[in-house]
């Protein structure tokens, strides 16, 4: 009887010792695997952080900020509309209650009070540096100015399309545009952008890479620049203003919750001729210039027709994302 008890005790003791040994072996093996993995990651990160001169960086970031998407299409009663207008409109109207008046008029078209937001901007160059379009539907009013035709056209191209962007370090790298949808977009204070195309030996074509004075000037004293160069050719860039931010961007397609309305002007802005605009229609319209009250009355009358050319999207445009997001 006592022999059986001793045997049982020894079996339990041996089992515990064996189990403890197995656990220690597994622990040592896991430690080895983890340390090995961390060592590989550390070595790899060192190589990844090294400078890599003369490469064409891939585009992986985005200037679009995603917010919660609706699970179903909602009627205008549950949508928001932002109306962007220049300061001169408020100055000319000179009525502290003018937005309240327009809100009541929008109500007659099915837009509840509080669903329409009036957003003021100083001028086209200022707005182009910091466009923020957050509503379900966004209508931008641009008063035609012959001296700002380029800024207006590039602003329309920027806000009417979605872009995938990466920051550019022009002090270390040279860049090339891979196709027609690939552009370099710069925002900031007034500056000049110059480029020097390179041959396969990375020597300048018609310019000297060490002398920016020989570079070809593609933009002069602008706040918003969408630069297009010859595809498949490496370029060295020079930006004269340090505060300007330039990004390597690719046009993804139309931003369908934005419309641009040109106010007045003998010339009509048109960006549909751009081969990257597909289909060849854009949400750009024109209203004859009269008085700002007349302009707003016209927009109220046709707001639902305008919105029907648009579609509610799950992305908003925030220039802060353009500057900082990788």
Swiss-Prot record:
Keywords: Calcium, Capsid protein, Disulfide bond, Glycoprotein, Host endoplasmic reticulum, Host-virus interaction, Metal-binding, Outer capsid protein, Signal, T=13 icosahedral capsid protein, Virion. The keyword Glycoprotein applies. Disulfide bonds join 82-135, 165-249, 196-207. Residues 253-255 are annotated as: GPR motif. Residues 1-50 form the signal peptide. GO terms for cellular component: host cell endoplasmic reticulum lumen; T=13 icosahedral viral capsid; viral outer capsid. Residues 237-239 are annotated as: LVD motif. GO terms for molecular function: metal ion binding. N-glycosylated. Residues 165-167 are annotated as: CNP motif. Its main location: virion. The keyword Membrane does not apply. InterPro entries: VP7, VP7_1, VP7_2. It holds the Pfam family VP7. It comes from the Viruses. Calcium-binding protein that interacts with rotavirus cell receptors once the initial attachment by VP4 has been achieved. Rotavirus attachment and entry into the host cell probably involves multiple sequential contacts between the outer capsid proteins VP4 and VP7, and the cell receptors. Following entry into the host cell, low intracellular or intravesicular Ca(2+) concentration probably causes the calcium-stabilized VP7 trimers to dissociate from the virion. This step is probably necessary for the membrane-disrupting entry step and the release of VP4, which is locked onto the virion by VP7. Belongs to the rotavirus VP7 family. Homotrimer; disulfide-linked. 2 Ca(2+) ions bound at each subunit interface in the trimer hold the trimer together. Interacts with the intermediate capsid protein VP6. Interacts with the outer capsid protein VP5*. Some rotavirus strains are neuraminidase-sensitive and require sialic acid to attach to the cell surface. Some rotavirus strains are integrin-dependent. Some rotavirus strains depend on ganglioside for their entry into the host cell. Hsp70 also seems to be involved in the entry of some strains. This is Outer capsid glycoprotein VP7. It comes from Rotavirus A (isolate RVA/Human/United Kingdom/A64/1987/G10P11[14]).
